[in-house]
Amino acid sequence: MQVYADNAATTAMSRTAIDAMLPYLDNIYGNPSSLHSVGQRAKEALDAARETVAQCLGCEPREIIFTSGGSEADNQAIISAARYGEKKGKKHIITTACEHHAVLHTLAKLEKEGFEVTYLDVRKGHNVTAQQVKDAIRPDTCLVTTMYANNEIGSILPIAEIGAVCKEAGVPFHTDAVQAVGHLHINVKEQNIDMLSLSGHKFHGPKGVGALYVRRGFPLVNIIEGGAQERGKRAGTENIPGICGMAAALKEACDHMDENMPRVAAMRDRLIEGLSKIPHSALNGDPVNRLPGNVSFCFEGIEGESLLLLLDMKGVCASSGSACTSGSLDPSHVLLAIGRVHDVAHGSLRLSLSEYNTDEEIDHILKVVPEVVQYLRNMSPVWRDLQTGKRQYIL
């Protein structure tokens, strides 16, 4: 049995998304900017997809800008707010310590330009509060940008409350909702969200396509110069097949959310209950306000990379919070931000589920993970030191 439990990294494309793309990979190949009939057929598809995405987010179609994915959307949102604030003498930004690198790296570049960034502490409850945001806002704050839900530890932030704080203070609010869209009910107007980023491949759509919701009237800055596509806010011929596939996948996800997500959450809870029985383990992330499919654990005395490789050999595709799999020896910045020490953060495991997973697959994971953890501990000098008292247990 092979179990795919890495849906926070990417999801399998749905049949609905594939079918929606096929006509635009075949005979409807026109450029939507062209005036002839072939181009106009593509434009009709583009307009319909924009309408679909807008309906799912609770906004107007003209407030949707199609992008190449969540990273581009994050960059454009943050840079736009920064440039707008700069013109008014405001160069202070608020974020959290556990954001995606698309946000953190963009903010780091702005810091080099003289912007000041406040990184909110997430150690308490592995989350932030609206009060933390309120306390951090200053007269020169030009943006609050927080994840909607964390890709690694699954914590869902109090977005509506943060949005209300920002609205009252007159500060633009952007949320990276890449992990939330298609999995949680979202209404950007009711939640006072000014900008929101999403990515198609996180909800069974294609890779390489995403969108940025921008509240009508907000001064968006181009980060790609060229033609006048996307109301002049994002140059480049639109990826019609990808956009149509993403819109179809999002509609399907939203239409079946109330049916699918409780079942996914039930599988998540089974995993959390079962893995919590492994000695010297700890759940990462908010235990209550949590994505339906996210399970994140740290196991003391093992290395995450070894855990992943052995799980893969036993048919479980998962991921680790440790960045060692990308060539770095440093543990995840998210795990460090919530207070995990280096040795513990290195022994992390993230299992992320979708509606395509089954109860039988959960049974397999619950059988395999404890076996692999014990196997690795039996070989670990760190674990031996813990058992003999040369080191002190942390978990």
Residue map of PLM features:
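Pyridoxal 5′-phosphate
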Residues: 1-395
